[in-house]
Each structure stands twice: as structure tokens, then as C-alpha cells.
Design a protein with these regions (language model features):
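Alpha-helix capping/hinge segments and adjacent helical runs
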Residues: 375-381
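Glycine-rich N-terminal segment of FAD-binding domains in flavoprotein oxidoreductases
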Residues: 1-58, 73-75, 93-95
């Protein structure tokens, strides 16, 4: 169970982080590194008490190399603050996770984040030029710093995704892109989720990588976009130079229609843009006593269909499961990520009378079913 920390400390620079870490190391005091606290896996919870290191005081853009397209930024900088600073230079990092408004650069790095425009701009690990890190003994190291290297291993990669367990990121150098002059959108209905996956795979394999390429199954399309519940929906958005954007969307259109797609109102994309970070609907269900969570699974294209069907069937078989849906959120040359949402309700009696233990049991049962099915089908959590 989580424990109360003995102190919450907010360092203002690298030197203060060094002093805090050194003192804690000498006394075997555990440190939990936090910032926006938007994560849902508990990494910012002090399980062993000790000291909570709140990095939000170390915030701001230090410098911008407009010629090279590199921004030097402090770890406690929240997403909107970073993008507002870069907009003055007509630049963007292109990293827009659902937690964009309430998460920080350091958190993105620590949790190996992927933004909603990742098909074009990549995940956070692909944006990192270099890092400054305070290690567990209080020493400071710098990694990377160049566009590429002909030697290895890549030291930065040791800390990306380590969730503050191997060191404290105190500074980052990230790649920045020129703000795109053109944005275009399209949307499609598919007769089945499987048809949509085939179209996505063909587009990606043809190196058509629009900034946004998201496929919703019929259940999630209806909930997210107000569909009729009969069709899966693909939304497409691309930024860039006009010729490149037109060519990219033309390839996606060809692949979509080859698998039975029909044009959907482009307003579906506008609706997603306006509401993409809104979780109020799910939160409202939680307040009514429903059990809700999400799970993201990566799989090669050859196993995406089996993962999708396996997770849906296994989770729906749990007593109390009410809804299981999915969308493909990130695509790669060899596979994609499926983002599942499951909703459960205690069915034995009035939901308001259900105990915490019953809710926890249902939650664990749905998670166990979903995870085991995903792994059995060849997915990676």
C-alpha cells in the first residue's frame, strides 16, 4: 500500500536535485519522482514513503536552435507551455498525448510517451537529441547531443521509459519541426474493423504516414463520434507541405476504398479534434459506480485481428462486463497499437449498494481476462 512521504521537495535546478538525491542516497531514503501526476499506472505514488521529488518548479524553455530545430527544455514544463514557447519560433515538437494539458516533458520521457500525432512525428524516444540526468548517487551525466552516432549503446534509451527509477531527468534537448503550412482531413466508414485494419496496414506499408490515422470499431465509433453502431470509422489528418499531404491522403484513400470503405463526413475528424482529450463521459460512469479502465496492446499486423477478437471475447465473458471496445491509436511499419476500453457493472444487486471489494473483484477479473487473451494472441502490453 502507498505510504505518506516524509517530505515533498521541489528543486529549482540541477544542483538542488543533486543535493537532494545525494542526501537520500547516503541515508537509504527512497525517492519518488513526480511532476504532472497524470499517469494511471501508479509510478508517481510513494509506495515506500521517503521523499517525493516534485519537478514542476524546473519549468521552461531554456533555448531554441531554430536552424537545427532543437529545443532545450526543463523537465517540469507542461505541454501547452512548451508548444506556446515554440510557436513564437514557428516550431512544434508534435507530441500531443491525451494528457497533453496536464503532463510534462519529464513525464513523457520517463513513461516513453506516444502522442496522438505519432504516426508522423514519432514517439518521445524518437524526439530526444540528448538528456541531462542526475543518477542515484547524485552524479550528473549528459547523453546524446548530436543528430546521430556511429557507436553504441544509446545511453539516452536507458532512461526513456524507466519512470524515474534509474535517474532524474533535469534537462532535455528535443527535435522540433517547422509548423506545417497545410492541414487536411478525411474520414471513412468500413463494413468491419478487420477491413479497416487491412487498409491501415497497406497505407503504412506504402509509407503513407499521416499525422493521425485512427480506426474505431463500431461500438467505440458510436460512443466517440455519434455513429450508428454499424460501421467502424477511420479518421485521417495530415500536416505538412501541400504536395506531400495530398499524396499521403491519396494513398490512404486508395487503400481504404480497396477494402470496402465509403467516405464519411469529415466532421468526424473535427469532432475528434475538439473532444479528443475529454474523458468526462467515462468519469460520469465511474461516479455512478461503474468499473472502467483502458488497456493498450501492441501487436504485429499479422496478429492484430486475433488480439482484437481474443480480448473482446474474453473480457465480455466476465460476469458483470457491460461494454468492451477498441481503436487503433498508433501505427508502425510492422504493426500497431490497439487501445481497449472496458466497462463493468456489479450485476448482483443495485449498483449503489455494491461494495468496494465487489468493484475491485470485477476490475481484476476484467483485467485478468483482457491481459491473458492479449498475450495468448501474441500481443505486447
Amino acid at each position: 500500500m502507498p505510504q505518506l512521504p516524509v517530505a515533498v521537495v521541489s528543486p529549482r535546478d540541477t544542483a538542488e536535485v543533486q543535493r537532494i538525491v545525494t542526501v537520500c542516497a547516503r541515508r537509504d531514503v527512497p525517492i519518488t519522482v513526480t511532476a504532472g501526476r497524470s499517469g494511471v499506472s501508479g509510478a508517481s505514488v510513494p509506495m515506500f514513503g521517503g521523499v517525493v521529488l516534485d519537478m514542476t518548479a524546473m519549468s521552461g524553455v531554456v533555448s531554441v536552435d531554430n536552424t537545427s530545430g532543437v529545443v532545450e527544455v526543463l523537465p517540469g514544463t507542461f505541454g501547452p507551455d512548451l508548444e506556446q514557447a515554440l510557436a513564437q519560433h514557428n516550431l512544434t515538437v508534435g507530441h500531443f498525448p491525451q494528457s497533453f494539458d496536464i503532463s510534462t516533458v519529464g513525464g513523457w520521457i520517463a513513461c516513453l510517451g506516444a502522442g496522438q500525432f505519432s504516426t508522423r512525428y514519432g514517439k518521445i524516444n524518437e524526439m530526444i537529441v540528448g538528456l541531462e540526468i542526475v543518477l542515484a548517487d547524485g552524479s550528473v551525466i549528459s547523453t546524446g547531443g548530436a543528430p546521430a552516432a556511429a557507436h553504441g549503446p544509446d545511453a539516452s534509451s536507458l532512461f526513456v521509459g524507466s519512470e524515474g527509477t534509474l535517474g532524474v531527468v533535469t534537462r532535455a534537448w528535443l527535435r522540433a519541426h517547422d509548423v506545417a503550412p497545410v492541414r487536411k482531413k478525411s474520414a471513412y466508414f468500413f463494413p468491419s474493423f478487420a477491413d479497416g485494419v487491412k487498409a491501415m496496414r497497406e497505407a503504412i506499408r506504402a509509407h503513407a504516414t499521416p499525422a493521425v490515422l485512427r480506426l474505431y470499431d463500431a461500438v467505440e465509433a458510436q460512443r466517440s463520434h455519434g455513429g450508428d453502431g454499424a460501421n467502424s470509422t477511420l479518421i485521417v489528418l495530415d500536416d505538412g507541405e501541400l504536395e506531400i499531404v495530398d499524396a499521403t491522403l491519396a494513398v490512404v484513400d486508395r487503400c481504404a476504398r480497396a477494402h470496402g470503405a465509403t467516405a464519411a463526413p469529415v466532421e468526424r475528424v473535427d469532432h475528434w479534434l475538439a473532444h479528443r482529450n475529454d474523458t468526462s463521459g467515462l468519469q460520469a460512469l465511474t461516479k455512478k459506480g461503474f468499473v472502467i479502465d483502458t488497456m493498450e496492446v501492441a501487436a504485429p499486423w499479422s496478429k492484430i485481428g486475433a488480439v482484437y477478437q481474443g480480448v473482446l471475447e474474453a473480457t465480455r465473458s466476465v460476469d458483470g462486463a457491460r461494454s468492451v471496445s477498441a481503436h487503433v491509436s498508433h501505427s508502425y511499419l510492422d504493426g500497431a497499437c490497439i487501445y481497449f476500453t472496458f466497462v463493468g457493472q456489479i450485476s448482483s444487486r443495485d449498483i449503489n449498494d455494491a461494495t468496494t471489494a465487489e468493484h475491485q473483484a470485477l476490475y481484476v477479473a476484467m483485467w485478468n481476462a483482457a491481459q491473458r487473451a492479449a498475450l495468448a494472441a501474441g500481443g505486447n502490453l
